[in-house]
């Protein structure tokens, strides 16, 4: 009982990220480790969207500096903006949801089938990679009808506009030693 209270206090002290667990659908491995690293290096959203920190750059040199430093500094935040745009695109397109359901349903059926026995076609055993390629081929017409290609380019374009404008107009925090530098006249 006391150990549970200590764990609960530790979780409360760590904030929201301690209580938000990664979904069980993401298998342990490189993908999960990458996502955990992104979550660990995320910058505070309050400073990310602080309207007082937005201004127009004075010249092209400052614009380039802002782009490079903000993309480096807010990289994890930008990844989650990208994932949010993907989620928005999928949720607002019912046909794309159907296409994704068909694809993941076919993959799940193939997964269950390979647990029971090997799939044999024309006397040859079909590898799991070929089975998943077949699932992709079967669901391709659904993705084509759903306009998945345009959805991909919409997400990429919206991401570039949002991230590019944020990185260009968000003022950088002065680095150590940068405050004392004088500009040439």
Curated annotation (Swiss-Prot):
Belongs to the PRA1 family. This is Prenylated Rab acceptor protein 1. Keywords: Cell membrane, Cytoplasm, Cytoplasmic vesicle, Golgi apparatus, Membrane, Synapse, Transmembrane, Transmembrane helix. The gene is Rabac1. Residues 30-54, 175-185 are annotated as: Required for interaction with prenylated RAB3A and VAMP2. The keyword Aminoacyl-tRNA synthetase does not apply. GO terms for molecular function: GTPase binding; identical protein binding; proline-rich region binding. It is a multi-pass membrane protein. GO terms for cellular component: glutamatergic synapse; Golgi apparatus; membrane; plasma membrane; synaptic vesicle. Changing residue 185 to D/K: Retention in the endoplasmic reticulum; does not form homodimers.
